Amino acid sequence: MSLWRQTPDLEQLNASQKNSIGDLLGIRFEAFDDESLTASMPVDSRTHQPFGLLHGGASVVLAESLGSMASYLCVDTSQYYCVGLEVNANHLRGLRSGRVTAVARAIHLGRTTHVWDIRLSGDDGKPSCIARLTMAVVPLAGRAG
């Protein structure tokens, strides 16, 4: 059984990134299945730190962007919206080029919070970062109880 309340439409998800940090960094939603959502980002001058490696903050932006969208797809958006409460990341190895791909899987989907495990890897498939994102599920004013 799928965890998605709304079936992900990758074209629509990518269009939603226009004029946002996701657009600026080249984040693209690429795939989904019943239990995960996948996005990637280029490792280039937009996402490098001064020594030519993928900036840890850029990895966190990818993780939070992916997990936030995953939470959005799990709620009734006519009654709720989701916002980040906490994100942490362990940077495991540096990347210099190519793409970094992130896969988000739910750890907990509660009434008021969602927790996501997000694994990032380089083109070689080796892990580069492990992140955990906690999202608040917030009722729209006057809509949910």
Curated annotation (Swiss-Prot):
Broad class of enzyme this protein falls into: hydrolase
- Domain of life of the source: Bacteria
The UniProt keyword set, sorted, is: Hydrolase
Entry's EC annotation: 3.1.2.-
Cellular component per GO?
cytosol
SUPFAM superfamilies in UniProt:
Thioesterase/thiol ester dehydrase-isomerase
Q: Which GO terms describe its molecular function?
A: 1,4-dihydroxy-2-naphthoyl-CoA thioesterase activity
* Family to which this protein belongs: Belongs to the thioesterase PaaI family.
Tell me the protein's name: Putative esterase PA1618
Source species: Pseudomonas aeruginosa (strain ATCC 15692 / DSM 22644 / CIP 104116 / JCM 14847 / LMG 12228 / 1C / PRS 101 / PAO1)
